[in-house]
């Protein structure tokens, strides 16, 4: 599961020139014999430590991390606790329902039981648990939310995996838990919106004004609109809820896949023979996306540690946090 629903509608062609480690960043030494689960946990912990050293209230929500919460021969209890400590929230897609060619089917009872057991760990530690199911009919949407509410989760539903529009409730009002409180941590959010593809909006201003008009406690969006990152003024505008109170604005950041439309991608990499060794297999479901050996020092330097690194750009723009996607990439390397 991942969130590669990204826009190419205005994305300019960026050819990265390489990112160099600054004196303010000290990623761990690259693993010689990596244990995939532990390396993803370590990456999340390092990103958290780095971000919070720059901005102590910075929030991180991980997507697809449920499997990393299970103690196994490869994932120790210490690593599980490290992950729980590193992240402020955990999101899981298709938690209660599966999308089967547009038809909603209940999640397998055994899988649901497993997911609930895994989410009990961060929930007990006071971390936010979010769910995202892809549903279209009102009756199933209501049931999905009731299931989440009964477990203390915060649930969002979307009509499609494109995540390209604001739900009708966000436009017309009436979202669950709508409030005018100041939200400073993800665990305080009573609702959230994830919108990663702004291609349906007529312009940058239309996109920003539409988001600003929604009443959500937290919104997850892309760092970029077209070929330019959002500015600190853009983010500050989005941090105010129209009904009063402050909300959280989180930026999307993939930690398990690279994409050929991101600014770090170099032109030479379009030829598979020239790709660095840390770029692994292509994601056939999302053309232009590639699983990465995320323990690589080169990939880590792309993610954080210099002025042009991805997380540093997010921090500079004033985002309240980052949404770490493709945390289940460890499964590729088992």
Question: Where in the sequence are the language-model features?
Answer:
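C-terminal motif of bacterial Sec signal peptides marking the signal peptidase cleavage site
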Residues: 21-24
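Bacterial N-terminal signal peptides that target proteins for export
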Residues: 2-11
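Glycan-processing catalytic domains of CAZymes
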Residues: 14, 26-334
